[in-house]
């Protein structure tokens, strides 16, 4: 009997539910519903509408139930670091802050006045970023946030949604790891860091790893959806963790680039890599599936283009890519990770002002802006990959690009040109596939990640890009390093 696995995949700009089924040695994915996920600005702060997300999940479940399809289990993955405060009565205390809220500007330095940067990094191995949950929690504590002061439990986004479905509170390993609250060696919540932000382990749900059962749908949810007591399985709750599980690699000599709103570039390791070099380069050691560590760097990704598109009206990606392809190469370059691009009111204006401030030609038309973004991302990928090579325990012979960005032919070719090794693109639905994979492993329908990767490699169309014009890109890389602000 075939088993259907219901995957909830929520990103920072959109979400969807997907029904995954294994058929004849392959995997079939069917999108059930797709919906936007927007920042909500109120009173100078940015929030996520978790009730809307919950409602969209219920809509997806109702659609499957209406068709008479059975569901073996449900798994939820989301973006990282954001969380919900839950009161002693079990109610959510307010909508969760979004990680792009400006209240965490300067937050790391405030915490480091009490516990050193080196100690925080040494315990967690996590890249220092303003919006990490550790710094969000410390900011709320310092600001006497009423929700945090009244909170009995802190639930990260995937865990909050599974709680709303099941009534069970858990803390899933991969999402807690990226929060900068997990000790990289013990793979458990780190008491000293929790104490530093006024919390303890009792403020979090039962600690679980990918593949463990959270609970079953509450009677209320069963009544609303028309479904039975379906189990909810903890997948890799951090979407990157689920995506990397689905990299279609046949050996371990690869790096991955999970390409979406964020670009996350890294390698898999068997143990954390925490030393002076990784700290200086600000690399992160995030928890993965089957005991692996994802040694990676967060890079600003398609956020740059997504925000530009807000002011460009109804434009398609193929249209923008075509315009960029027709423009002069290397006219303008930016550092995609410059703070000025974190959440500007006008992204195109931020890019042009950056180019002007660094003495470059200013993009004058839309295609030039897009080309600037793509070339800058490709060159930034090269910069990060060079650092990654020095840290990786294995040689890097191929870059696997997964996620929505894997459909961008122009950026993929630029990336191959810049890094000088083959780029293998696909699957674009890596996060949903990884989510389904982990559920299937929990159900006994799949054995291990290595076997699942081989199945994906056989059954999902992939495209390989060979490096071209490498001498031109080598020269551009020198220019990139000289002209961009660090």
Cite the ranges covered by each PLM segment:
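Short beta-strand-loop/turn "lid" adjacent to the catalytic site in phosphate-handling enzymes
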Residues: 62, 66-98, 127-133, 158, ...
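Short glycine-rich phosphate-binding loop at a beta-alpha junction
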Residues: 70-78, 153-154, 206, 391-403
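Pocket-flanking alpha-helical
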Residues: 84, 106-110, 243-245
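Active-site core segments that coordinate phosphate-bearing ligands/cofactors
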Residues: 2, 7, 19, 112-124, ...
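Short, well-ordered amphipathic alpha-helical segments that serve as non-catalytic structural scaffolds
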Residues: 52-65, 186-192, 380-387
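N-terminal glycine/serine-rich phosphate-binding loop of ATP-dependent small-molecule kinases
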Residues: 1-94, 122, 222-232, 419-421
């Amino acid at each position: 009997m075939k088993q259907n696995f219901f995957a909830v995949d929520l990103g920072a700009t959109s979400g969807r539910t997907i029904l995954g089924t294994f058929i004849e040695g392959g995997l079939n994915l069917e999108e059930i519903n797709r919906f936007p996920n927007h920042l909500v600005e109120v009173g100078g702060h940015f929030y996520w509408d978790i009730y809307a997300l919950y409602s969209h999940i219920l809509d997806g479940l109702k659609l499957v139930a209406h068709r008479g399809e059975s569901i073996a289990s449900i798994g939820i993955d989301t973006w990282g670091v954001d969380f919900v405060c839950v009161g002693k009565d079990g109610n959510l205390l307010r909508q969760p802050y979004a990680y792009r809220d400006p209240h965490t500007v300067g937050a790391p330095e405030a915490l480091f006045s009490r516990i050193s940067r080196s100690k925080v990094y040494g315990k967690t191995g996590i890249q220092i970023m303003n919006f990490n949950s550790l710094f969000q929690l410390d900011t709320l504590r310092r600001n006497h946030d009423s929700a945090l002061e009244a909170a009995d439990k802190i639930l990260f986004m995937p865990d909050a949604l599974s709680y709303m479905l099941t009534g069970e509170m858990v803390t899933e390993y991969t999402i807690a790891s990226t929060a900068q609250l997990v000790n990289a060696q013990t793979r458990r919540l780190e008491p000293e860091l929790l104490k530093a932000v006024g919390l303890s382990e009792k403020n979090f749900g039962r600690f679980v790893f990918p593949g463990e059962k959270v609970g079953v749908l509450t009677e209320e949810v069963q009544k609303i959806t028309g479904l039975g007591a379906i189990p909810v399985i903890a997948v890799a709750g951090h979407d990157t963790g689920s995506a990397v599980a689905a990299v279609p690699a046949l050996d371990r000599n690869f790096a991955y680039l999970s390409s979406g709103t964020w670009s996350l570039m890294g390698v898999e390791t068997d143990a954390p890599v925490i030393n002076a070099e990784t700290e200086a380069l600000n690399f992160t050691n995030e928890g993965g599936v089957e005991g692996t560590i994802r040694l990676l760097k967060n890079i600003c990704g398609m956020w740059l283009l997504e925000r530009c598109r807000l002011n460009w009206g109804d434009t398609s990606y193929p249209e923008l890519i075509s315009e960029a392809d027709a423009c002069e190469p290397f006219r303008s370059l930016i550092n995609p990770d410059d703070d000025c691009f974190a959440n500007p009111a006008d992204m195109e204006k931020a890019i042009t002002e950056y180019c002007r401030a660094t003495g470059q030609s200013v993009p004058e038309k839309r295609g030039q802006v897009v080309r600037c973004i793509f070339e800058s991302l490709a060159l930034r990928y090269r910069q990060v990959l060079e650092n990654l090579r020095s840290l990786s325990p294995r040689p890097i012979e191929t870059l696997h690009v997964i996620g929505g960005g894997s459909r961008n032919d122009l950026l993929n070719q630029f990336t191959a040109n810049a890094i000088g090794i083959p780029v293998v693109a696909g699957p674009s639905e890596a996060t949903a596939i990884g989510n389904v994979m982990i559920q299937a492993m929990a159900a006994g329908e799949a054995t291990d990640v290595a076997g699942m990767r081989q199945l994906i490699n056989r059954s999902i169309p992939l495209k390989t890009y060979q490096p071209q014009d490498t001498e031109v890109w080598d020269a551009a890389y020198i220019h990139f390093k000289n002209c961009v602000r660090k």
